Amino acid sequence: MLTYETWEENDISFSEEDETKGALSVLSWAYKEYENEIVYACSFGVEGMVLLHLINQVNPSAKVVFLDTNVHFQETYELIQKVRERFPSLNIIEKQPKLTLDEQAKLHGNKLWESNPNLCCKIRKILPLEESLANEKAWISGLRREQSETRKHTKFINQDHRFQSIKVCPLIHWTWKEVWRYVYKHSLPYNPLHDIGYPSIGCEKCTLPVGEGGDSRDGRWAGKVKTECGLHYQ
């Protein structure tokens, strides 16, 4: 088994000639390699809808973790329920932070997402994912190279130094148009916020719509240097 500890620059290759540009082959390999020791960390963005559909074909009882920060859009929570109905055998876990919002405010002040967004992300996303990955050998992410400068070198199989794990990224070669084409073709549910200018959807407090021609990550932590929550830093 390929693990963080046994990592070597591997020569594992996947055909990119099918409709999924290698994604289905990558997922088939991942679930064969790690069996029940792999989890998909899903934010329920539009890429997530594609991956859930593909994962359901490969492993209908796969583990899926959603980092419930308690400050997501209501539309996101409603979408999760629709996904549960569409893929009832998937094991969707809504992972909560250890601190409630009130407890966080007492310790760090009100609106931590404004005063110290990095700390807020650490408490409500990074630490919960660390806990979720503690007993796993690998995790799946919906990163695409096209999304941003920080993601353009992502590979199918990555040694993830942040979480000391193997990170599997099946959609690296997909474009934004290809993601939507797949969603429409398979009549997949998706967050209606995408239809009103939100290409990337995170917490309600830190996500704004993006103007025409803007980068897909422009609406995240708008007005701040921050462009990533920290889950994908190496």
Swiss-Prot record:
Binds 1 [4Fe-4S] cluster per subunit. Its EC number is 1.8.4.10. Pathway: Sulfur metabolism; hydrogen sulfide biosynthesis; sulfite from sulfate. It comes from Bacillus thuringiensis subsp. konkukian (strain 97-27). It is an enzyme of class 1 (oxidoreductase). GO terms for cellular component: cytoplasm. The active site is at C229. It is found in: Cytoplasm. This is Adenosine 5'-phosphosulfate reductase.
